[in-house]
Amino acid sequence: MENKGIRKILPHRYPFLLVDRIIEIEEGKKAVGIKNVTANEPFFQGHFPDNPIMPGVLIVEALAQVAGIAVMNIEEFKGKLGLFTGIDKCRFKKVVRPGDQLVLEVLIDSIKMGLVKAKGVAKVGDEVAATAELMFIMTEEG
């Protein structure tokens, strides 16, 4: 799924759309996305000008967006909004820099009454950059 398809599902837009492409999806079960991290990312202007590092919270947000794509493709959740309710066991293991390609792998653990629990792993090559357990609720509005 290319960027145009992602924009049909997610409400996020530049500069906060953090997924460039979906390379694998099993509706309601898993999704794998790609974020090509470029030197032109707006967050690098201040984080940090002489030592650019992608903020960890944005890596987690990118994982959440991939999870949202896996869930928002389900008929009952189309057009709904996913809002974070929690992040557990989040760990940052590798610095992500301009030129890196983040592979964002998300497994959906459960969906009950609109509450989604998922596990995410962000990798650069074979190295794990971040892991997190994500929880969000599917809702009509924010």
UniProtKB/Swiss-Prot annotation:
<protein>
    <recommendedName>
        <fullName>3-hydroxyacyl-[acyl-carrier-protein] dehydratase FabZ</fullName>
        <ecNumber>4.2.1.59</ecNumber>
    </recommendedName>
</protein>
<keyword id="KW-0444">Lipid biosynthesis</keyword>
<dbReference type="GO" id="GO:0016020">
    <property type="term" value="C:membrane"/>
</dbReference>
<dbReference type="GO" id="GO:0005737">
    <property type="term" value="C:cytoplasm"/>
</dbReference>
<dbReference type="GO" id="GO:0019171">
    <property type="term" value="F:(3R)-hydroxyacyl-[acyl-carrier-protein] dehydratase activity"/>
</dbReference>
<dbReference type="InterPro" id="IPR010084">
    <property type="entry name" value="FabZ"/>
</dbReference>
<keyword id="KW-0443">Lipid metabolism</keyword>
<comment type="similarity">
    <text>Belongs to the thioester dehydratase family. FabZ subfamily.</text>
</comment>
<dbReference type="GO" id="GO:0006633">
    <property type="term" value="P:fatty acid biosynthetic process"/>
</dbReference>
<dbReference type="Pfam" id="PF07977">
    <property type="entry name" value="FabA"/>
</dbReference>
<dbReference type="GO" id="GO:0009245">
    <property type="term" value="P:lipid A biosynthetic process"/>
</dbReference>
<keyword id="KW-0441">Lipid A biosynthesis</keyword>
<keyword id="KW-0963">Cytoplasm</keyword>
<feature type="active site">
    <location>
        <position position="47"/>
    </location>
</feature>
<keyword id="KW-0456">Lyase</keyword>
<comment type="function">
    <text>Involved in unsaturated fatty acids biosynthesis. Catalyzes the dehydration of short chain beta-hydroxyacyl-ACPs and long chain saturated and unsaturated beta-hydroxyacyl-ACPs.</text>
</comment>
<dbReference type="InterPro" id="IPR029069">
    <property type="entry name" value="HotDog_dom_sf"/>
</dbReference>
<dbReference type="InterPro" id="IPR013114">
    <property type="entry name" value="FabA_FabZ"/>
</dbReference>
